[in-house]
Structures are given as structure tokens and as C-alpha cells.
Swiss-Prot record:
This is ATP phosphoribosyltransferase. It comes from Staphylococcus epidermidis (strain ATCC 12228 / FDA PCI 1200). Keywords: Amino-acid biosynthesis, ATP-binding, Cytoplasm, Glycosyltransferase, Histidine biosynthesis, Nucleotide-binding, Transferase. Belongs to the ATP phosphoribosyltransferase family. Short subfamily. HAMAP family: HisG_Short (MF_01018). Pathway: Amino-acid biosynthesis; L-histidine biosynthesis; L-histidine from 5-phospho-alpha-D-ribose 1-diphosphate: step 1/9. Its EC number is 2.4.2.17. One of its GO terms (biological process) is L-histidine biosynthetic process. Lacks the C-terminal regulatory region which is replaced by HisZ. Catalyzes the condensation of ATP and 5-phosphoribose 1-diphosphate to form N'-(5'-phosphoribosyl)-ATP (PR-ATP). Has a crucial role in the pathway because the rate of histidine biosynthesis seems to be controlled primarily by regulation of HisG enzymatic activity. Heteromultimer composed of HisG and HisZ subunits. GO terms for cellular component: cytoplasm. The lineage of its organism: Bacteria, Bacillati, Bacillota, Bacilli, Bacillales. The keyword Cell cycle does not apply. It catalyses: 1-(5-phospho-beta-D-ribosyl)-ATP + diphosphate = 5-phospho-alpha-D-ribose 1-diphosphate + ATP.
Length: 204
């Protein structure tokens, strides 16, 4: 039995859509019908649904053999895992966003302090970065900050709140990661999963 840790939320929705595209209907159906279950089994695969930022920890600790997680999570911290594959779904990007008339960014809110700080340092910008856990758009709408750094997929949330993308920061995509010990002990099961996903190994 191969245990796979999946990130709940946006990435899970994208993963289910991809499974349907590659005709892995059984797995997609189980995930769609999960209700509030956090542990699901299908085709010799046990799936655990966890917060995105926790996926690498479950894999690193050996609780899960494999994980599917956004590259943004992996960039924020070092983990003792194999970053095995780039996956062809879950694509979006980090961006700096603000009101259309704003051109000076002294105070910026984000849930992704590491990414934002790296970006502003690289750009040579002196910015105060404020950490928020969610609804970062609101902080800009009510003028608590000049701008936000957030994940953008379609841009509809920005538009709905009267904000526009000012600067592209970096791309995000889904990655398949493995526990280092499981990579050898369950190599055949991992290879089977990779074939089911219709992708090939290219070390990242």
C-alpha cells in the first residue's frame, strides 16, 4: 500500500481535474465523493488530505511515502526529501498586486513572507512586509498596506477587489515528492503511480 499526502484546497481541485483528463476516474471519483474524510483508499493507494504546508513534513517523517505539493511550499523551507517530478497541473504564480493608481510600495501584506522578502531584496526595494494568514486583498482595499504579494491563478479575486497585478514574481507548479527511504523500498509502487499520472521522471 502506497500512502500519498495531498494538499487540500486549490491544488486538490486542480489534481482532480487532471486525474479526469488522464482517465484515472476511480481515484478522481473517490476524491470528489470524500465529504469530510481525510483518509481515503483506492487501487492500493491510501491518500491522506492535509494542509499544503504540512505535506513535506508528512513525507519527510515517513508518514506518507509520496506527496503532491505546490512548489511555493518547498521554496519556503528545506526538507530532507526527494523532489522527484514537476507535474503538469496546479500552475499559477506569485505576483505583486495593488490598486491601479498605486506605484510606490512601502508597506506590503502577504501570507508568503519568505517569497516576498526574497523578491524585494532582489529588486533592491526597501519594503515593510506584514504577515497575514488570509484575505490579504482586504488589507490593500482598506489602505492598511500599499500592495500585496499573493498567488494568482485567474486574477478574478484581484479584479473583484479592485486590484491589478503590478509585477510578476515567480511561477508555481505542483511537484511530486517522496520520502527518501520509501523511494527505494517502494520504488515499484511509486513508478506505478507515476505511470498512472502520465508523467516521466526529470529530477528537480
Amino acid at each position: 500500500m502506497l500512502r500519498v499526502a495531498l494538499a487540500k484546497g486549490r491544488l486538490l481541485k486542480s489534481f482532480i481535474e487532471y486525474l479526469q483528463q488522464v482517465n484515472q476516474i476511480d481515484i478522481a471519483t473517490v476524491l470528489l465523493n470524500r465529504q469530510r474524510q481525510l483518509l481515503l483508499t483506492v487501487d492500493n493507494i491510501e491518500m491522506i488530505l492535509v494542509k499544503g504546508s504540512d505535506v513535506p513534513t508528512y513525507v519527510e517523517q515517513g508518514i506518507a511515502d509520496v506527496g503532491i505539493v505546490g512548489s511555493d511550499i518547498l521554496n519556503g523551507q528545506k526538507y530532507n526529501i526527494n523532489k522527484l517530478l514537476d507535474l503538469p497541473f496546479g500552475k499559477c504564480h506569485f505576483a505583486l498586486a495593488a490598486k491601479p493608481e498605486t506605484s510606490c510600495y512601502k508597506k506590503v501584506a502577504t501570507s508568503y513572507v519568505h517569497t516576498a522578502t526574497q523578491f524585494f531584496n532582489k529588486e533592491g526595494m526597501d519594503v515593510e512586509v506584514i504577515h497575514l494568514n488570509g484575505s490579504v486583498e482586504l488589507s490593500c482595499v482598506v489602505d492598511m498596506v500599499d500592495a500585496i504579494v499573493d498567488i494568482v491563478q485567474t486574477g478574478s479575486t484581484l479584479t473583484a477587489n479592485g486590484l491589478v497585478e503590478k509585477k510578476y514574481i515567480s511561477e508555481i507548479n505542483a511537484k511530486l515528492i517522496t520520502n527518501k527511504e520509501s523511494y527505494f523500498k517502494q520504488s515499484s509502487e511509486i513508478e506505478r503511480l507515476i505511470k498512472q499520472l502520465g508523467v516521466s521522471i526529470s529530477y528537480a
